[in-house]
Amino acid sequence: MGESKTTTGEGFGFYKEYVAGMMAGLATVAVGHPFDTVKVKLQKHNTDVQGLRYKNGLHCASRILQTEGVKGLYRGATSSFMGMAFESSLMFGIYSQAKLFLRGTLPDDGPRPEIIVPSAMFGGAIISFVLCPTELVKCRMQIQGTDSLVPNFRRYNSPLDCAVQTVKNDGVTGIFRGGSATLLRECTGNAVFFTVYEYLRYHIHSRLEDSKLKDGYLVDMGIGVLTGGLGGIACWSAVLPFDVAKTIIQTSSEKATERNPFKVLSSIHKRAGLKGCYAGLGPTIVRAFPANAAAIVAWEFSMKMLGIKRD
């Protein structure tokens, strides 16, 4: 058994992979958004010289719950659901189609990095253009709240208000602030994620080949949880600094703010050291496993329900 591959029928079959990807995105936000809110607040306030410093992710989460309730943890979720549904649909669909194209007539004798990596990076590059504006809105909504340092006159009433005000103040290019950091994060992150996922999935299924546990929804779900979760941890461990830079760039209200992610990280390192470049590591890693596990389980289950055969 080689790397995971999909086989669809004629007609609507081509689009089924994109539908399955959309379901993966919805599952990701439902499970992971509260952790993401904590991560963004830590990245915004714990890297600012004059920022409110939270002791850790748990302290940040407790402050949000005390001042805003559970609703505060899902601040900005509307744009996340919309963005992630579309983004995941594109990511999983493009990744699957790119693999089919690059594999061609090559023998299916195991995962091939020369197929997985470019397929994942290509998908990551495409979705970065979708993610950049939606994540800018999400991040700006997330840093607001009772416990925020954002002045009241700079706050937004809704995701739509945030998008409109951003375009009004900064022009159309303003909504794509942080595009370079998003591109770096998505290309690198997806290459790491799918490489770990494919190799783990291949080796686990290889060991179960002659086992009675080979088939079954619970077995497939368990493998999906493990491979997706570990892939998510590997991905975010590799790209968190790019994500920190993206958050700083996107949440700044100043037009003249530095937008080169490497220069932003250099500045953060001077102020807060390596720890500053990994601000939000705790909630990010805690979120990475369940959120990405949910994405893979939802993706694989949806494909099975849609009649997409996977080897």
Curated annotation (Swiss-Prot):
TM stretches of this protein: 18-38, 76-96, 113-133, 178-197, 222-242, 288-308
List GO terms (cellular component aspect).
Answer: mitochondrial inner membrane
Q: Which Gene3D superfamilies does the UniProt record give?
A: Mitochondrial carrier domain (1.50.40.10)
What PROSITE patterns does the record tag this protein with?
Answer: SOLCAR
Found, by tissue, as follows: High expression in flowers and siliques. Lower expression in leaves and stems.
| Membrane disposition | Multi-pass membrane protein
The places in or outside the cell where this protein is found are: Mitochondrion inner membrane
pH and activity = Optimum pH is 7.0-9.0.
- Extract one GO molecular function annotation from the record: L-lysine transmembrane transporter activity
InterPro entries found in the cross-reference section: Mitochondrial_Carrier, Mitochondrial_sb/sol_carrier, Mt_carrier_dom_sf
Instruction: State what inhibits or activates this protein.
Output: Inhibited by mercuric chloride.
What are the UniProt keywords, alphabetically?
Membrane, Mitochondrion, Mitochondrion inner membrane, Repeat, Transmembrane, Transmembrane helix, Transport
Q: Does the keyword Membrane apply?
A: yes
Tell me the ranges holding the Solcar repeats: 12-101, 111-203, 219-305
* Principal localisation: mitochondrion
Q: What does this protein do?
A: Mitochondrial arginine transporter that catalyzes the counter-exchange of arginine with lysine, ornithine, arginine and histidine. Substrate preference in reconstituted proteoliposomes is arginine > lysine > ornithine > histidine. May be involved in the delivery of arginine, released from seed reserves, to mitochondrial arginase and the export of ornithine.
Its family? Answer: Belongs to the mitochondrial carrier (TC 2.A.29) family.
Name the record gives this protein: Mitochondrial arginine transporter BAC1
Q: Which organism is it from?
A: Arabidopsis thaliana (Mouse-ear cress)
User: What gene codes for this chain?
Assistant: BAC1
